[in-house]
């Protein structure tokens, strides 16, 4: 029962993350770089800091978390900065492919590589940890089935691209470009997988038994998102200067509206990793699911992003065969979340 509860919590977080682009559509008169970094203040700084504080027991301070973990802190933030590059290209993948297909390919690549790269790199830096032992047959099988589901959805996307006229493509996704979007989505997925690598390096940054299991991932999550914020801030502020959009932040008439929806978008985005930490607290009896939890989160993100894609009519005009392939991919992804428990 605890495992089911853990998976349900992760699923709720995935649903929230897949919904985070809905409030962004309500933002008015701000350029992309302006609203992206403002929502990032909530998603990558404020809320992760509040989450990390939950890992600090009474009588201790936040900064005690990092005592004796200098190398781990540095590596966690470094991979957070690399993940930040993935976040930037992630947005471009949805620009050219739409929410459903863009998230599917990027998150699928992220799921597979993120799950595998963590133990591999930990084994290089800390061979005594024997991190590679966590990559069991069940874990690898779960990753393979997840990637199979992503591939099926990718086939649906290719079928969509070949069956629609240019006018229909533009009506569904304004800047639709499958080859360009696919390249960017694969890059975004590779770099985004660094998030889980950062979590792996920061897995010991907590107060041991004094920190409840469900909160132990939150300090590392904060460090990763701080690293990502740095990368995104550099790029967004550069774009503010290049495009002369610094004035966006001074538009008082839209300030309240935009801050509200940026905060909502940030909260929905962060909820996936808050939910991941809470959910893992219920998965401690299953080492396989603990290792595969990031992959499960990404798979469920893809499932819900495609549900939103259908709601937002991004698949409008596609044949019933294309929709059937899409649904098959979604079913395979859901199946992949439970498969490791049956192997």
What is the meaning of each model-derived region?
Residues 1-343:
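Polytopic alpha-helical membrane proteins, predominantly small-molecule transporters/carriers
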């Amino acid at each position: 029962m605890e495992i089911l509860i853990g998976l349900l919590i992760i699923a709720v977080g995935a649903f929230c993350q897949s919904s985070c682009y809905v409030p962004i559509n309500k933002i008015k008169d701000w350029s992309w770089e302006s609203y992206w970094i403002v929502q990032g203040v909530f998603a990558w700084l404020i809320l992760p800091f509040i989450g990390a504080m939950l890992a600090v027991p009474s009588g201790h301070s936040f900064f005690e978390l990092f005592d004796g973990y200098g190398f781990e802190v540095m590596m966690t933030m470094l991979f957070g900065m690399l993940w930040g590059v993935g976040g930037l290209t992630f947005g471009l993948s949805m620009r050219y492919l739409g929410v459903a297909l863009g998230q599917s390919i990027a998150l699928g690549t992220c799921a597979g590589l993120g799950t595998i790269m963590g133990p591999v790199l930990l084994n290089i830096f800390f061979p005594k940890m024997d991190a590679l032992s966590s990559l069991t047959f069940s874990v690898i099988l779960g990753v393979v089935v997840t990637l199979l589901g992503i591939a099926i959805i990718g086939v649906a996307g290719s079928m969509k691209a070949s069956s629609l006229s240019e006018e229909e493509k533009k009506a569904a996704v304004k800047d639709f470009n499958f080859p360009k979007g696919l390249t960017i989505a694969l890059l975004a997925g590779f770099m985004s997988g660094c998030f889980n690598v950062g979590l792996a390096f920061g897995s010991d940054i907590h107060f041991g038994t004094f920190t409840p299991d469900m909160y132990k991932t939150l300090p590392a999550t904060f460090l990763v998102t701080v690293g990502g914020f740095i990368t995104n801030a550099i790029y967004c502020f550069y774009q503010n200067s290049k495009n002369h959009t610094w004035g966006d932040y001074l538009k008082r008439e839209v300030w309240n509206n935009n801050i509200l929806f940026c905060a909502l978008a940030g909260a929905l985005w962060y909820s996936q990793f808050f939910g991941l930490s809470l959910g893992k607290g219920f998965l401690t009896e299953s080492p396989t699911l603990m290792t595969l939890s990031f992959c499960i989160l990404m798979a469920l993100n893809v499932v819900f992003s495609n549900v939103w894609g259908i709601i937002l009519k991004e698949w409008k005009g596609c044949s019933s065969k294309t929709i059937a392939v899409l649904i098959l991919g979604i079913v395979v992804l859901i199946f992949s979340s439970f498969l490791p428990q049956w192997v």
